[in-house]
């Protein structure tokens, strides 16, 4: 049953739904291994040395390479839900929760910076490529020490993206279904792409190359986790024999049900009980 599917989503670089605990008072707690800090706090204290940037990026991609083939998309990746301990082990948390939130409701700032342009441009159709965009933003922030696209609101968010990447390409504009959005995009000043080398003078060629592949305006052209992890930049860590892929599609169908929150708790609870028996 579903318990099985969750069990298969156990992975070293992910804090899974199995670590959720529901108290008798119906509060949901997340039991996380005590990981010393998160990437947001780490980045605000000091610049990261290149070997750490590489190792952290590698572990994030290793997690995505595992879950994406199972049809699981995080949708809300940002430095504060990337947990890191003193051995530099990295785990992504809040997988599965992003699904419970209506993307239009999560307008708070920290998330917006890392949100892929197609989420703002089309709302309906988006897939695992949104996670790659978010990781690209986090990668840039690890290199540069500050958020790459600090938008003040939705509109400004798209503007700061076009200031670096240039105007959205035709094939992206053609996917926009909302007339209002289309008008907004057409009204944006036409911009040329700024060379990444110019924007990130401290980055080396391999970093620039991978970053450009992750921050592609077009989600269909954006590099996948499986391809990104094989990029020469990550060669020091890449080990095909130690990068598992989830072996079945994950059943999130219960997430689409329109249920009151207290019922959610029960469902999640039963999922976890089924699984912990194994």
UniProtKB/Swiss-Prot annotation:
Protein name: Mitogen-activated protein kinase HOG1
Keywords: Activator, ATP-binding, Cytoplasm, Kinase, Nucleotide-binding, Nucleus, Phosphoprotein, Serine/threonine-protein kinase, Transcription, Transcription regulation, Transferase
GO molecular function annotation: ATP binding; MAP kinase activity; protein serine kinase activity
Keyword Transcription: yes
Keyword Cytoplasm: yes
UniProt lineage: Eukaryota, Fungi, Dikarya, Basidiomycota, Wallemiomycotina
InterPro entries: Kinase-like_dom_sf, MAP_kinase, MAPK_p38-like, Prot_kinase_dom, Ser/Thr_kinase_AS
GO CC term (a single one): cytoplasm
Its job: Proline-directed serine/threonine-protein kinase involved in a signal transduction pathway that is activated by changes in the osmolarity of the extracellular environment. Controls osmotic regulation of transcription of target genes.
Protein EC: 2.7.11.24
Assigned protein family: Belongs to the protein kinase superfamily. Ser/Thr protein kinase family. MAP kinase subfamily. HOG1 sub-subfamily.
Positions carrying Phosphothreonine: 106
Gene3D superfamilies (UniProt xref): Phosphorylase Kinase, domain 1, Transferase(Phosphotransferase) domain 1
């Amino acid at each position: 049953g579903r318990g099985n599917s969750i069990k298969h989503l156990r992975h070293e670089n992910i804090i899974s739904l199995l670590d959720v605990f529901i108290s008798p008072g119906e509060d949901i707690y997340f039991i996380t291994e005590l990981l010393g800090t998160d990437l947001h706090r780490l980045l605000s204290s000091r610049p990261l040395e290149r070997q750490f940037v590489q190792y952290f990026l590698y572990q994030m991609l290793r997690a995505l390479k595992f879950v994406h083939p199972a049809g699981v998309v995080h949708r809300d990746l940002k430095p504060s839900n990337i947990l890191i301990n003193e051995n530099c082990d990295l785990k992504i948390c809040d997988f599965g929760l992003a699904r419970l939130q209506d993307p239009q409701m999560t307008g708070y700032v920290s998330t917006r910076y890392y949100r892929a342009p197609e989420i703002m441009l089309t709302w309906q159709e988006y897939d695992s490529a949104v996670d790659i965009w978010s990781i690209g933003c986090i990668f840039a922030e690890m290199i540069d020490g500050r958020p790459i696209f600090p938008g003040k609101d939705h509109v400004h968010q798209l503007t700061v993206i076009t200031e670096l990447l240039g105007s959205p390409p035709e094939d992206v504009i053609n996917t926009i279904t909302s007339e209002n959005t289309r008008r907004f995009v057409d009204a944006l000043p036409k911009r040329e792409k700024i060379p990444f080398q110019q924007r990130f003078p401290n980055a080396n060629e391999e970093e620039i190359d991978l970053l450009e592949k992750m921050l592609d305006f077009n989600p269909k052209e954006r590099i996948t986790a499986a391809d990104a992890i094989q990029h020469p930049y990550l060669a020091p860590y890449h080990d095909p024999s130690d990068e598992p892929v989830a072996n079945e599609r994950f059943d999130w169908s219960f997430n689409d049900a329109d249920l009151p929150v207290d019922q959610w708790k029960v469902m999640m609870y039963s999922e976890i009980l089924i699984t912990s028996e194994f």
